[in-house]
């Protein structure tokens, strides 16, 4: 375990110590050492909290093999790979092991008991007992054999293992794993030919590995460990190493930080300042806070700033010592004693705080407590008091004699007596305080001087044993510290003359250690003959196995840190008890109970034999094993204790890439509490801050000088973790110098070659972006690295090094060239490092084509045809001189996924917005959002909270801060959260379980934390129990174990993945693979080589979901050449960090399960894949129907316009961002209308199409080309319509009509000039039936998307509505309205709706109506008309598009122009979102290009506006057709439904039980446009009383979001009746208009009333009824008469709606 909390403390104090590493960023290492026990625990019991978890041995072994493979692959050691499993530990360690195993057995037992008490059914198989990971058990013996098999297999089959020496020190070799590794390192260092620049990497989880690594005094030493997360909710550990984030902790930086920590000593000490000796003393100080061998000193805790205290004391006392304390592992006792004496002041300071509290306590309760406490010590302390008093008086008299004032002398004497009394009392209490500690903790009766002297000697002896163990290895196997607690610092004295001597002894045998450390609960791990010793009452050692025991936190906070109070084993008694049983051991058991040597293995091609499988049913034998062995004796690596030399590190040596140093940039350092965030929270202690020193006066900082020194050159960035990069631009915020190169060029310009550069001056926007970049970089350096970079004068833009690639010259020479990322990243100039001598070991032996493509080597084709095919190089001697290679390619059969791509929406999980769930469940959208996230409940009440503990009772299905979602339950689309039916069912179940919790949170939505007693205030209600019940239910629910994924991850759902697997299986059955022999140019071949790892094979390839790919990486978990399909894409900030989830065609060892069959999935970077589909697209020139997803930065939460999701945006009658996709097959009528509308679209696009590039969502090249093709196909330049439009005199005129004056002028002009173009437009709709039928047979082009039948119907009506809106007033206004109303059909099911050609007369009437001149007083009913110059309807161009129409209509009604934004869908479609200033938000369907999406979205917006009319009312109730998620009667109302009627005529009893308080005055219909006076009501010149008009003098409209209330049982029960009535009422809706002389009243037949009550918005009504409502000021609609329609005549409401003030629920 090492040192608790040490790793976190050290990482936060020195923020640059660790870095998160990706595989391509790992530096080169010579030696890799694995402390295996961490891996074994990780793979065998990843989640101890799950009592249902079971795992088989073969799964454990396979996972361990895979973990080892990945670690080897990540580090790629060049010389040595050392695997060390813990063997028998020294006796000093066994006590800690014993306590840990007793605790884990008891915890497991308690968890099982709790599960059984809850009624859980546990699996019948035995659970994995983690105590079996102890030397000598059957499990460890099996693992040992399997690890030997694994090493042989890898050496024989994996090229990357064949040049490395492998050491395997198993559980049979005595010693802890990490100390066996250190023994090897010490022996290597002792050799005369040792290379001081050897690069070491040690993998392990123990914090004390930092100290171990520093004892080596090696310059290049790093620690690899898994990412440790602190402070968050405990999550299940991930077994797969691919999913694991690794940290690399650099001891090179640790050494420099320690130097800074003690640099003040350079000026204070008289002897030589030696950083190596300072590091030795630093290691010694680390032991004083406790470790595996000794307990911590009293009250000295890391999280209570113990280490700064130790360091500060050292800085104070070292100048007085005359030398260092730790002399290469030997303790200098006189110096150590002086240090401890100085440190013991802490004991008194700590007690003084306690003493002050006691004095206060005494003042409250009298002297009784102190008198009793001091009783025993009073007598002993009397002499001490007298001595101290006399001494104090002498000192006082000396001082007071100097003063001649007698009065002052008397006063001083009085004060002296008071102070002396206080000091005496303090010392008495201090001694009694320590006495109580020893009596209670150590169980002694008399705390004598001999006892204290023994304590001191034991502690110092322990420190010396540990120093030997770390520096020289085990000096005594049998020594151990015999107490559970350490003595007080102030009691460790008189130690300078101690004689410390250790007897080496012998290590325990495996079974002896098992019996010494295992509890009785794990007795089955021992041979049967020993088991009775742990359980039989007559056993001579039964007292060492207590069934129950106590633990003592002893000042610690976590239970796992507590002292386990079990007796120490008496070695002699243990061995005597075992002696009587040894004769019963079986032969196999005797073999397990012995020590064995370490194995050294290496590859020998001349050695070949069959290695048998340790488990033939699971693992195959190795047919051609090429491994040689050497046995290393147990003491071969022991170094003489006096020969342990310290390596002197050459400070002027070359910089080794990947081993960071702080030396390259001038800076100063200081300690400050800056809250640097290394882990999940800001640090609370001091941070070692680094401040970069910049000479502001220097000419070097001018942008011209910076550009001339770095542009086009290689520099190192990201100080102090330097990475090489190529500079492509430099800017100072005003001017920018950049390389002017042909596309694809990535050349370094060295020497006198001047790079081709260009200078530009930045505009305001670019200058603002530059400032933001600088601010972002500065904040990152400060918040994460603790580096202050100060003022920035220049920013360098560079491409990071991704790897090296073989390039072939024209003459056939082969060079290994650096490859740079396409992505350009900004770095501030003062953090880059130039002109450093870096050591580069990546030399290549490959010089010619023959070297690069040897006979029978594997290659991949990067040209067409046969793109991505695997090939084998043949003899090319006759063609290689011509620069060609002969290859035989295998061409396998490929599955056809086109049909699946087209129909993917049928298999995708459907997600809905939160308010749809809210409607179905009968709760508010706020509750849906809150309960699917986190909800914290504290103990007690808000007024009287009980402690700081808070329980999270949220479902945890979405994580905004972490940008994570739970696939299958939640999905983030842009900035909106969507929910599946599974999430809905989970919420419904929660609502049924805890309705009172929902009710309370709905009423108190403004609070962040809720309290038990406030939610359940009743005396009989136990809030704590209720919270515990909820937590138990949540933990037991399967959703609690589901994994989260990043919202940036685009995925295909499991159902689609299953269909892909089916297609692949069908393809396999065809088996028509063929082979072809071709000669290929070498640059079109890719050969997998280790030197090329990290390089993308084909940089032009673009990756999409459904793409077919092949793995081209050798010595990888995935077999080279295996094909698969991309089923997920995880974006990242860097190109190299993008990961693809691939479903492979075959199962393979180490394969993951990613929504697919077991063992067929894996996550790979771009550099490991060749995209087969990209080759197909290149060959055919066709673009795929799925989304093009180039490796791109992860989408930030705020950039909704470029957000990527896997949802499917549908079309019409659905909520904004609804994921509904129409699946109905278009009918013949649909096609007829579609053809008409597309012909109109095509003929109207060219004039207004202006390709624009969105700032956040750049148009992809493919999309632009598609758009251009689409426009070209619309019409020919020579067509009549085109010529007519080209010469349209009104085009330029329209451009000028933007100012109010021009608008008024255009109004006059429009009344004079007739519009002849509209006649042609309407005549074009007159198409014969025969042509329609004929055209329907030809079909649509494949790239065009079919609209749903609803779209066609709505589109037709919308077309008519557009025309109607264009001319909305005439001289005889009422007659026109009546005429139009009669012409537009009411039933949406009639054939005439689609059959436009069958209504030629009607079209002409509409045309004549449209061409009538319009008067300026058309909008005289609109208020504040005098304050505005209204734009008049000007001449309509011959043919307009929906976008231009929408813009024109917005101008007509005084609204700003519509706002268009785009959403990129995962299957390559684009969706446009239209937002109007009146609050209307409309989404179009999925389209292939942005322009098409924009047009169709505008079309849908026009439908909405056309249906709404001028005074836009609220939109329709979206959820009327959704069924309730919960069956009737399951959700009780949160409040009893009140009786009575509201003043709108609604029956309260039939309404909802309001979770959110209703506002009765807000239930009225809200206008979307200018408000209209209503007779009999007070008229306000705003939307409603109390609101202010919007800018511009007229309110653009308001749409208040409605909040659904809880559905009552009664309403749910009547659901079916409402649906029946709704279905009947939608058949037909007769409408009558009033006489000209009477008020316009809409009359609805009785059959319609129930439907009307369900559809709160007029959208669902026929268009004619809206025109009637859109009356002039003189003919206003009477609200009194129409009230019965919407309120009093309906029987009941399906959904109660609260039109409160708009409040976003997400």
From Swiss-Prot:
InterPro entries: 5_3_exoribonuclease (IPR027073), 5_3_exoribonuclease_1 (IPR016494), SH3_12 (IPR041385), XRN1_D1 (IPR040992), XRN1_D1_sf (IPR047007), XRN1_D2_D3 (IPR041106), Xrn1_helical (IPR041412), Xrn1_N (IPR004859). The gene is XRN1. Keywords: Cytoplasm, DNA-binding, Exonuclease, Hydrolase, Nuclease, Phosphoprotein, RNA-binding, Tumor suppressor. Belongs to the 5'-3' exonuclease family. This is 5'-3' exoribonuclease 1. Down-regulated in OGS biopsy. SUPFAM superfamilies: dsRNA-binding domain-like. GO terms for cellular component: cytosol; dendrite; membrane; neuronal cell body; nucleus; P-body; plasma membrane. Residues 1647-1657 have a biased composition (Low complexity). Expressed in heart, brain, pancreas, spleen, testis, osteogenic sarcoma (OGS) biopsy and primary cell lines. Its EC number is 3.1.13.-. Residues 1619-1706 are annotated as: Disordered.
């Amino acid at each position: 375990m090492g040192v608790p909390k040490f790793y976190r403390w050290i990482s936060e104090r020195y923020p640059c110590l660790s870095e998160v590493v990706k595989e391509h960023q790992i530096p080169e290492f010579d030696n890799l050492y694995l402390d295996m026990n961490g891996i074994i625990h990780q793979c065998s019991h990843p989640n101890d909290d799950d009592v249902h978890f079971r795992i088989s041995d073969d799964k454990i072994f396979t996972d361990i093999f895979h973990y080892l493979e990945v670690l080897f692959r990540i580090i790629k050691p060049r010389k040595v790979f050392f695997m060390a499993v813990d063997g028998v530990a020294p006796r000093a360690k066994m006590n800690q092991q014993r306590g840990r195993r007793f605790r884990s057995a008891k915890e497991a037992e308690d968890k099982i008991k709790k599960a059984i008490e809850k009624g859980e059914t546990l699996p019948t198989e035995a659970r994995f007992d983690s105590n079996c990971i102890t030397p000598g058990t059957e499990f460890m013996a099996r693992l040992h054999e399997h690890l030997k098999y694994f090493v042989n297999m890898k050496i024989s089959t994996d090229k990357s293992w064949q040049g490395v020496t492998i050491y395997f020190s198993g559980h049979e070799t005595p010693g802890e794993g990490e100390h066996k590794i250190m023994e090897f390192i010490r022996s290597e260092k002792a050799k005369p030919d040792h290379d001081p620049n050897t690069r070491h990497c040690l993998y392990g989880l123990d914090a004390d590995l930092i100290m171990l690594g520093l004892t080596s005094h090696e310059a290049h030493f790093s620690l690899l460990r898994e990412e440790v997360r602190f402070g968050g909710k405990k999550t299940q550990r991930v077994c797969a190493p691919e999913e694991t984030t690794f940290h690399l902790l650099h001891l090179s930086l640790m050494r420099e930080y320690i130097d800074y920590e003690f640099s003040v000593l350079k000026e204070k000490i008289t002897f030589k300042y030696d950083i190596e000796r300072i590091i030795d003393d630093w290691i010694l100080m680390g032991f004083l806070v406790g470790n595996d061998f000794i307990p911590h000193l009293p009250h000295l805790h890391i999280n209570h700033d113990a280490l700064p205290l130790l360091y500060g004391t050292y800085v104070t006392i070292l100048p007085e010592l005359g030398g260092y304390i730790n002399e290469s592992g030997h303790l200098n006792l006189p110096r150590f004693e002086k240090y401890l004496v100085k440190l013991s002041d802490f004991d008194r300071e700590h007690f003084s705080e306690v003493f002050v509290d006691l004095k206060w306590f005494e003042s409250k309760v009298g002297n009784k407590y102190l008198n009793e406490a001091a009783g025993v010590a009073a007598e002993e302390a009397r002499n001490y008091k007298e001595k101290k008093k006399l001494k104090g008086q002498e000192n006082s008299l000396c001082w007071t004699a100097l003063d001649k004032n007698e009065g002052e002398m008397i006063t001083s004497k009085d004060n002296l007596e008071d102070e002396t009394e206080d000091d005496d009392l303090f010392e008495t209490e201090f001694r009694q305080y320590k006495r109580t500690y020893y009596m209670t903790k150590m169980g002694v009766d008399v705390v004598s001087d001999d006892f204290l002297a023994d304590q001191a000697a034991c502690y110092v002896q322990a420190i010396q044993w540990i120093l030997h163990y770390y520096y020289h290895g085990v000096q005594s196997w049998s020594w151990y510290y015999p107490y559970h607690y350490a003595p007080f610092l102030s009691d460790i004295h008189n130690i300078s003359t101690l004689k410390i001597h250790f007897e080496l002894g012998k290590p325990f045998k495996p079974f002896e250690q098992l019996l010494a450390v295992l509890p009785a609960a794990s007795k089955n791990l021992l041979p049967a003959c020993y088991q009775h010793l742990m359980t039989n009452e007559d056993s001579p050692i039964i007292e060492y196995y207590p069934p129950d025991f106590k633990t003592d936190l002893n000042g610690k906070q976590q239970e796992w840190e507590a002292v386990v109070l079990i007796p120490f084993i008496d070695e002699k008694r243990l061995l005597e008890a075992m002696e009587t049983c040894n004769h019963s051991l079986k032969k196999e058991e005797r073999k397990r109970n012995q020590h064995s040597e370490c194995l050294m293995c290496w590859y020998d091609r001349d050695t070949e034999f069959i290695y048998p499988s340790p488990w033939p049913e699971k693992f195959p034998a190795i047919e051609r094993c090429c491994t040689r062995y050497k046995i290393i004796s147990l003491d071969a690596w022991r170094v003489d204790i006096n020969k342990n030399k310290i390596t002197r590190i050459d400070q002027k040596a070359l910089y080794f890439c990947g081993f960071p140093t702080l030396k390259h940039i001038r800076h100063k350092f200081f300690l400050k509490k800056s809250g640097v965030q290394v882990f999940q929270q800001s640090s609370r202690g001091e941070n070692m801050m680094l401040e970069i020193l910049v000479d502001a006066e220097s000419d070097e900082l001018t942008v011209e000088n910076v550009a001339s020194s770095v542009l086009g050159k290689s520099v190192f960035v990201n100080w102090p973790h330097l990475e090489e990069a190529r500079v492509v631009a430099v800017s100072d915020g005003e001017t920018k110098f950049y390389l002017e190169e042909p596309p694809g060029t990535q050349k370094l310009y060295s020497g006198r070659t001047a790079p081709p550069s260009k200078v530009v001056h930045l505009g305001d926007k670019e200058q603002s972006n530059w400032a933001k970049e600088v601010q972002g970089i500065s904040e990152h350096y400060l918040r994460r690295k603790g580096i202050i970079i100060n003022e920035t004068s220049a920013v360098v833009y560079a491409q990071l090094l991704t790897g090296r690639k073989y390039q072939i010259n024209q003459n056939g020479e082969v060079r290994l060239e650096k490859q740079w990322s396409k992505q350009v990243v900004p770095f501030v100039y003062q953090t880059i490092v130039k002109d450093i001598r870096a050591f580069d070991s990546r030399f290549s032996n490959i010089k010619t084509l023959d070297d690069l493509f040897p006979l029978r080597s594997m290659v991949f084709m990067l040209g067409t045809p046969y793109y991505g095919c695997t090939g084998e190089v043949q003899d090319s001697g006759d063609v290689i001189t011509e620069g060609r290679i002969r290859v035989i390619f295998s061409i396998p059969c490929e599955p056809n996924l086109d049909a699946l791509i087209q129909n993917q929406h049928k298999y995708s999980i459907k997600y809905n917005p939160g308010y749809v769930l809210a409607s179905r469940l009968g709760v508010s959208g706020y509750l849906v959002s809150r309960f699917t996230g986190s909800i914290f409940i504290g103990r007690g009440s808000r007024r009287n909270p009980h402690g700081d503990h808070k329980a999270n009772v949220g479902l945890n299905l979405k994580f905004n801060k972490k940008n994570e979602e739970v696939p299958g339950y939640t999905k983030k689309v842009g900035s909106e959260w969507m929910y599946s039916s599974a999430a809905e069912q989970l919420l419904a179940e929660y609502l049924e379980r805890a309705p009172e919790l929902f009710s309370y949170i709905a009423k108190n939505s403004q609070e962040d934390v809720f309290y038990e007693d406030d939610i359940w205030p009743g005396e009989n209600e136990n809030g704590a129990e209720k919270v515990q019940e909820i937590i138990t239910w949540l933990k037991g629910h399967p959703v609690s174990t589901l994994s989260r994924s990043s919202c940036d991850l685009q995925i295909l759902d499991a159902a689609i993945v299953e269909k892909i697997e089916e297609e692949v299986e069908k393809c396999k059955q065809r088996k028509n693979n063929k082979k072809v022999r071709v000669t290929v140019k070498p640059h079109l071949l890719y050969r997998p080589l280790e030197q090329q790892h990290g390089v993308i094979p084909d940089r032009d390839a673009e990756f999409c979901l459904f793409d077919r790919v092949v793995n081209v990486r050798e010595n990888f978990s995935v077999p080279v050449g295996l094909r698969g399909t991309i089923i997920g894409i995880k974006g990242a900030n860097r190109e190299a960090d993008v990961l693809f989830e691939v479903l492979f065609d075959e199962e393979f060892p180490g394969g993951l399960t990613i929504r697919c069959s077991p063992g067929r999935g894996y996550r790979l970077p771009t550099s490991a894949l060749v995209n087969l589909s990209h080759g197909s697209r290149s060959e055919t020139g066709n673009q795929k129907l799925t989304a093009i997803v180039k490796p791109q930065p992860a989408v930030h939460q705020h950039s909704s316009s470029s957000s990527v999701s896997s949802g499917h945006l549908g079309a019409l009658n659905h909520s904004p961002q609804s994921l509904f996709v129409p699946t109905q097959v278009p009918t013949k009528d649909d096609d007829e209308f579609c053809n008409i509308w597309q012909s109109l679209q095509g003929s109207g696009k060219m004039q207004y199409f202006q390709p624009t590039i969105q700032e956040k969502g750049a148009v992809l090249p493919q999309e632009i080309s598609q758009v251009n093709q689409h426009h070209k196909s619309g019409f020919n330049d020579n067509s009549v319509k085109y010529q007519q439009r080209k010469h349209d005199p009104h085009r330029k005129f329209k451009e000028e009509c933007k100012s109010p004056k021009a608008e008024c002028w255009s109004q006059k002009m429009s009344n004079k000039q007739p519009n002849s173009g509209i006649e042609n437009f309407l005549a074009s709709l007159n198409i014969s039936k025969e042509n329609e039928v004929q055209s329907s047979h030809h079909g649509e082009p494949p790239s065009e998307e079919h609209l749903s039948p609803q779209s066609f119907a709505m589109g037709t009506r919308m077309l008519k509505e557009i025309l109607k809106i264009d001319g909305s007033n005439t001289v005889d206004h009422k007659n026109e309205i009546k005429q139009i109303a009669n012409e537009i059909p009411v039933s949406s099911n009639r054939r005439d709706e689609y059959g436009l050609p069958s209504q030629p007369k009607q079209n002409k009437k509409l045309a004549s109506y449209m061409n009538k001149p319009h008067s300026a007083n058309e909008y005289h009913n609109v208020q504040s008309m005098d304050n505005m110059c209204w734009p008049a309807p000007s001449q309509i161009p011959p043919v307009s598009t929906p976008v231009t129409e929408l813009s024109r209509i917005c101008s007509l009604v005084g609204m700003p122009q519509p706002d268009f934004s785009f959403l990129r869908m995962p299957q390559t479609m684009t969706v446009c979102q239209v937002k109007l200033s009146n609050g209307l938000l409309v989404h179009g369907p999925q389209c292939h290009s942005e322009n098409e999406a924009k047009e169709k979205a505008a079309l849908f917006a026009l439908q909405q506006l056309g249906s709404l009319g001028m005074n836009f009312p609220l939109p329709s109730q979206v959820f009327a057709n959704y069924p309730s998620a919960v069956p009737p009667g399951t959700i009780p109302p949160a409040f009893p439904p009140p009786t009575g009627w509201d003043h709108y005529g609604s029956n309260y009893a039939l309404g909802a039980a309001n979770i959110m308080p209703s506002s009765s005055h807000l239930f009225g219909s809200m206008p979307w446009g200018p408000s209209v006076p209503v007779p009999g009501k007070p008229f306000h010149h705003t939307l409603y009383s109390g609101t202010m008009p919007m800018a511009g003098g007229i309110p653009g409209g308001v749409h208040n979001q409605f909040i659904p209330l809880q559905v009552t049982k009664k309403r749910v029960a009547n659901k079916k009746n409402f649906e029946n009535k709704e279905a009947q009422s939608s058949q037909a809706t007769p409408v009558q208009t009033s006489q000209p002389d009477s008020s316009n009243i809409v009359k609805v037949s009785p059959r319609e009333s129930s439907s009307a009550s369900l559809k709160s918005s007029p959208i669902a009504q026929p268009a004619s009824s809206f025109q009637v409502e859109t009356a002039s000021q003189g003919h206003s609609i009477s609200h009194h008469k129409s009230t019965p329609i919407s309120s009093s005549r309906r029987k009941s409401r399906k959904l109660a709606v609260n039109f409160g003030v708009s409040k976003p629920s997400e």
